[in-house]
Swiss-Prot record:
Pfam families: Pkinase. The gene is SSN3. InterPro entries: CDK, Kinase-like_dom_sf, Prot_kinase_dom, Ser/Thr_kinase_AS. It is found in: Nucleus. Residues 167-179 have a biased composition (Basic and acidic residues). Keywords: Activator, ATP-binding, Kinase, Magnesium, Metal-binding, Nucleotide-binding, Nucleus, Repressor, Serine/threonine-protein kinase, Transcription, Transcription regulation, Transferase. The lineage of its organism: Eukaryota, Fungi, Dikarya, Ascomycota, Saccharomycotina. Component of the SRB8-11 complex. The SRB8-11 complex is a regulatory module of the Mediator complex which is itself involved in regulation of basal and activated RNA polymerase II-dependent transcription. The SRB8-11 complex may be involved in the transcriptional repression of a subset of genes regulated by Mediator. It may inhibit the association of the Mediator complex with RNA polymerase II to form the holoenzyme complex. The SRB8-11 complex phosphorylates the C-terminal domain (CTD) of the largest subunit of RNA polymerase II. It catalyses: L-seryl-[protein] + ATP = O-phospho-L-seryl-[protein] + ADP + H(+); L-threonyl-[protein] + ATP = O-phospho-L-threonyl-[protein] + ADP + H(+); [DNA-directed RNA polymerase] + ATP = phospho-[DNA-directed RNA polymerase] + ADP + H(+). Component of the SRB8-11 complex, a regulatory module of the Mediator complex. Its cofactor is Mg(2+). This is Serine/threonine-protein kinase SSN3.
Length: 567
C-alpha cells in the first residue's frame, strides 16, 4: 500500500511538472502579450458560433399550431390572450395502445380523482408524450420539488371521510359524457404579450416577470384544485402556456344566476365551491406561495364540477425573502378583493390577503354581486400608488370602523391618517347577509372569520376547512359542485373572429407604407388611383410653365423701363 501510494504521488507530481513546462513553453511562444497577460487560446469562430445551433433548434422545434388546433378566442387581459384549442393527436389518444400504456405512468393528484380524471390522465399523458423525447417544448411533468406536499391524502385525519361523496356514485349519463370527452381533449392556450404595437424588434425586453413566475410555479405545483399546466412553447419571442381546459368559471356562474333575474346559487353548491377553493389555497400556502389575485374570474370549474384556481401571474413565494413584498409589486389583488391592510399601505403582508379575497368571493356567491364594489383611483403620471378612499369606505360601511383594540398596530399603517378622517360606522355584516338571502349561521360565522380586519387573527385556509360550516349539517360536502342540479350552465363563449394566434410565426414589425416618388420613366403611375398618366401630367405642367414663363418675361420687360425711370 505504501509503494502504491508513493507511485501515485510520483505520477501526480510528474504530471504537474509536465503541465507546468507546457505552460512555460506557451508563455515563451506567446511573447506578444497585451498588458502582460497571456492571450487565451480560442477556437475558430466557425466552431463556437451560435447561428447553426439556433437554426438546428428552430428547425426541430414543434410549433404550437402543429400540435393544437385553435377553436377560438376566450378572453384577454394585461398578460395577453387565452384561446380554446384541441389536440391534433386526439385520435391517437383514443387508441388503446397509447392511452393504456401512458395511463400507468400517470398518478392521480388527489383522492378525489374519479374514474373520469383517471381516464383523462392517460389521454393527458399521451398528449404530453406525443412527440417523444425529441420534442423541444417544455413539458410540465409532475411534481419535481420534494418539499411540495398535497393535502388531499386519504390518510389525512383532518379531512372527515364522511363529508366526502365518493366519485363512484356518478350516474350513467355522466359516464357516457366522460367517454365522449375522452376522444376530444380541449385545452386553454395562454399567449403572453412580448411586444408593444408590433415594434418588438426594436424594443423587445424579453419574457415578462409575470410569465416567468407563472411558468416556474405551475411546473412545480401539483394539486387537483389548481389548473394543471400541460406544456410550454417558446416561439417567435412569444410564450404559449397550454393548460387543461375548464368549461366554466365563477364569474360566469354568478352572472348566470343574476341575469336576467336573480336566482340564488344552491347552498350545497356554494359549500362545495368554498371547500375546494380553500383546499387549493391551503396547498399554495403550505408550499409558501401567495396567489395575490384571487377573484371569481380566476376560479375555474370543469365539466366534472371540480374547482380549480388559475392565473398565477401575480403569485410569488414568500419564504426566505430578501426584500419586502411592496418592493417587487406595489399593487396586487383586484381592487374589489383587496385586503384592508393593502389599502392602508402595508409594505409587507402575509397569506392573510388571500383569505380576505376568499371571503369576498364567498360573499359574492351568496349575494350574487361584489360585496365591496368600490371605484378604483388610478395612478398619476408619476406612478405613485393612490389612496383608495372609495374602496375602503365601502368596507367600513359593512364591517364597521376598526379600532386599535380590534386591530392592534392599526396606527402604524402609512394611511392611518386617511382612515381617521372617515366617519365612524357600525358593523352591518349580519344585516347585509340576511338581505342577500343568507340563512345559515355557520356561513355567517365563516364569513366573519374570513373578513376579519386584523390579518393576524384572520382565519387561515387549514383552519377554515375545519370550520363548522363544512362539518355541521346532514348534507355532506360533495366533490362535484353540480351534484343534484337539474339544469346546466352555458358553455364558454368562443369568439372565432379574433384568432391572431393563427398568424403565429408572422410577428413582424409594423412598417409604414412606402411612399412611391413619382418618376418620369413610370408611364403607368397614377395619381390618387384615378388612372391619370403621369406623362400627360408632366407635359401639361411643362406647357403651363412655358406659358407662364412667356407672360412673366413679357411683364418683366414692361416693368424694366419703369424701374429705370424711378432710378
Amino acid at each position: 500500500m505504501q509503494n502504491s501510494g508513493r507511485d501515485l504521488w510520483q505520477n501526480q507530481s510528474g504530471y504537474m511538472s509536465s503541465l507546468q513546462q507546457g505552460l512555460n513553453k506557451s508563455n515563451m511562444v506567446g511573447a506578444s502579450t497585451s498588458h502582460g497577460k497571456t492571450p487565451m487560446l480560442m477556437a475558430n469562430n466557425d466552431v463556437f458560433t451560435i447561428a447553426p445551433y439556433r437554426t438546428r433548434k428552430d428547425n426541430a422545434r414543434v410549433s404550437v399550431l402543429d400540435k393544437y388546433e385553435i377553436i377560438g378566442y376566450i378572453a384577454a387581459g394585461t398578460y395577453g390572450k387565452v384561446y380554446k384549442a384541441k389536440s391534433r393527436q386526439s385520435s391517437k389518444s383514443s387508441s388503446s395502445t397509447g392511452s393504456d400504456s401512458l395511463a400507468q405512468d400517470t398518478k392521480p393528484t388527489t383522492e378525489f380523482s374519479n374514474t373520469s380524471s383517471l381516464q383523462n390522465a392517460g389521454t393527458y399523458g399521451d398528449m404530453m408524450g406525443a412527440h417523444g423525447p425529441n420534442s423541444n417544448n417544455i413539458s410540465a411533468g409532475g411534481n419535481t420539488n420534494p418539499e411540495l406536499s398535497t393535502r388531499n391524502n386519504p390518510n389525512n385525519p383532518r379531512v372527515p371521510t364522511s363529508t366526502i361523496i365518493s366519485g363512484d356514485k356518478r350516474n350513467s349519463e355522466n359516464t357516457d359524457n366522460r367517454r365522449k370527452a375522452e376522444t376530444t381533449m380541449y385545452y386553454a392556450i395562454k399567449k403572453f404579450k412580448t411586444e408593444k404595437d408590433g415594434i418588438e424588434q426594436l424594443h423587445y425586453t424579453g419574457i415578462s416577470q409575470s410569465a416567468c413566475r407563472e411558468m416556474a410555479l405551475c411546473r412545480e405545483l401539483d394539486n387537483n384544485h389548481l389548473t394543471k399546466l400541460v406544456e410550454i412553447f417558446l416561439q417567435k419571442k412569444s410564450i404559449y402556456m397550454v393548460y387543461e381546459f375548464a368549461e366554466h368559471d365563477l364569474l360566469q356562474i354568478i352572472h348566470f344566476h343574476s341575469h336576467p333575474e336573480k336566482r340564488m346559487i344552491p347552498p350545497r353548491m356554494i359549500r362545495s365551491i368554498m371547500w375546494q377553493i380553500l383546499d387549493g389555497v391551503s396547498y399554495l400556502h403550505q408550499n409558501w406561495v401567495l396567489h395575490r389575485d384571487l377573484k371569481p374570474a380566476n376560479i375555474m370549474v370543469t365539466m366534472d364540477g371540480v374547482v380549480k384556481i388559475g392565473d398565477l401571474g401575480l403569485a410569488r413565494k414568500f419564504s426566505n425573502m430578501l426584500q419586502t413584498m411592496y418592493t417587487g409589486d406595489k399593487v396586487v389583488v383586484t381592487i374589489w378583493y383587496r385586503a384592508p391592510e393593502l389599502l392602508l399601505g402595508a409594505r409587507h403582508y402575509t397569506p392573510a390577503i388571500d383569505l380576505w379575497a376568499v371571503g369576498c368571493i364567498f360573499a359574492e356567491l351568496i349575494g350574487l354581486q361584489p360585496i365591496f364594489k368600490g371605484e378604483e383611483a388610478k395612478m398619476d403620471s408619476k406612478k405613485t400608488v393612490p389612496f383608495q378612499a372609495n374602496q375602503l369606505q365601502r368596507i367600513l360601511k359593512i364591517l364597521g370602523t376598526p379600532t386599535p383594540k380590534s386591530w392592534p398596530h392599526l396606527q402604524k399603517y402609512p394611511e392611518y391618517e386617511q382612515l381617521s378622517k372617515f366617519p365612524k360606522y357600525r358593523d352591518n355584516l349580519p344585516g347585509w347577509f340576511h338581505s342577500a338571502g343568507g340563512r345559515d349561521k355557520h356561513a355567517l360565522s365563516l364569513l366573519y372569520h374570513l373578513l376579519n380586519y386584523n390579518p393576524i387573527e384572520r382565519i387561515d385556509a387549514i383552519n377554515a376547512l375545519d370550520h363548522s360550516y363544512f362539518t355541521h349539517g346532514d348534507m355532506p360536502v360533495c366533490e362535484n359542485v353540480f351534484e343534484g342540479l337539474n339544469y346546466k350552465y352555458p358553455a364558454r363563449r368562443i369568439h372565432t373572429n379574433d384568432n391572431d394566434i393563427l398568424n403565429l410565426g408572422l410577428h413582424k414589425p409594423k412598417v409604414p407604407a412606402k411612399v412611391v416618388q413619382p418618376t418620369m420613366n413610370n408611364s403607368t403611375a397614377t395619381l390618387g388611383g384615378l388612372g391619370v398618366n403621369k406623362r400627360i401630367l408632366a407635359a401639361a405642367a411643362a406647357a403651363a410653365a412655358a406659358v407662364s414663363g412667356n407672360s412673366s418675361s413679357q411683364s418683366s420687360r414692361n416693368m424694366e423701363p419703369m424701374k429705370k425711370k424711378r432710378k
